[in-house]
Amino acid sequence: MAEVLTVLEQPNSIKDFLKQDSNIAFLAGGVAGAVSRTVVSPFERVKILLQVQSSTTSYNRGIFSSIRQVYHEEGTKGLFRGNGLNCIRIFPYSAVQFVVYEACKKKLFHVNGNNGQEQLTNTQRLFSGALCGGCSVVATYPLDLIKTRLSIQTANLSSLNRSKAKSISKPPGIWQLLSETYRLEGGLRGLYRGVWPTSLGVVPYVALNFAVYEQLREFGVNSSDAQPSWKSNLYKLTIGAISGGVAQTITYPFDLLRRRFQVLAMGGNELGFRYTSVWDALVTIGRAEGVSGYYKGLAANLFKVVPSTAVSWLVYEVVCDSVRNW
């Protein structure tokens, strides 16, 4: 305790602490994740509703009509339901990704990321991105599970209304849901329900996101140094949007599986699906819903992912530069 107070009393010590590469990556990554997810929270809510509903419920009328429906039924608060928990989850989730990625750069591949002349190969980028994606999932998955369940607790899903999940007049809070899931669904096994399909989606998504962004950034690094800051920031926004869109489109079917496995215990039969494994889910969706079933909610997700990834990369770069130049 005395050591902490001593550090707080010495501004230079705080600066030196924050300017360590791992701490810069943690702080910038966490802030970037929280800001970017808040910006697109309404699309995140609607995307989850589209993913877990049956084909006959009212949220099938389109992205913006679904957003309007949520607003009319639940108000502005409904558009951001679960976002507080999402920010609590996304700060360490995003921070862990950037810390592990930077650690892979410097410790594993001995590349100085601040030197524009030193770059990872595409294979190294994919490996580092996959590793940081896996670490972030394991570290924060229970919060992701609870966030998904909170998102659909108050939704007007007629099939879910008939299940036990809607038998209460007031939705449970974060800690109540965590406690109930742990107690009623097998302890840690319940809290990590769906972690396998989640990892199958997140690991390649993060790998592609980092690899595409860094490759595009490398293309523009020489010209962007001489450009005004607004042009450089616009370029970062653009390539961030591209990297997120490409990665999400390729890996989206696994994101759909992730959400469905997360809500199985809330009334999967009533929602119209029940799976015994990832392979069973893939086969069942293909037979019952066709190829389009694998991409249900993709449009809403792209409305979320493209601006979210763009903002995330830009905020990360800006915070990193600000702390380094402090």
Curated annotation (Swiss-Prot):
SUPFAM superfamilies: Mitochondrial carrier. It is a multi-pass membrane protein. PROSITE patterns: SOLCAR. The chain crosses the membrane at residues 24-40, 84-104, 126-143, 195-213, 237-254, 297-316. It comes from the Eukaryota. Solcar repeats lie at residues 20-107, 120-219, 231-322. One of its GO terms (molecular function) is nucleotide transmembrane transporter activity. GO terms for cellular component: mitochondrial inner membrane; mitochondrion. GO terms for biological process: 3'-phospho-5'-adenylyl sulfate transmembrane transport; 5'-adenylyl sulfate transmembrane transport; adenine nucleotide transport. It is found in: Mitochondrion inner membrane. InterPro entries: Mit_carrier, Mitochondrial_sb/sol_carrier, Mt_carrier_dom_sf. Keywords: Membrane, Mitochondrion, Mitochondrion inner membrane, Repeat, Transmembrane, Transmembrane helix, Transport. The keyword Repeat applies. Belongs to the mitochondrial carrier (TC 2.A.29) family. PANTHER family: SOLUTE CARRIER FAMILY 25. This is Uncharacterized mitochondrial carrier YPR011C. The lineage of its organism: Eukaryota, Fungi, Dikarya, Ascomycota, Saccharomycotina.
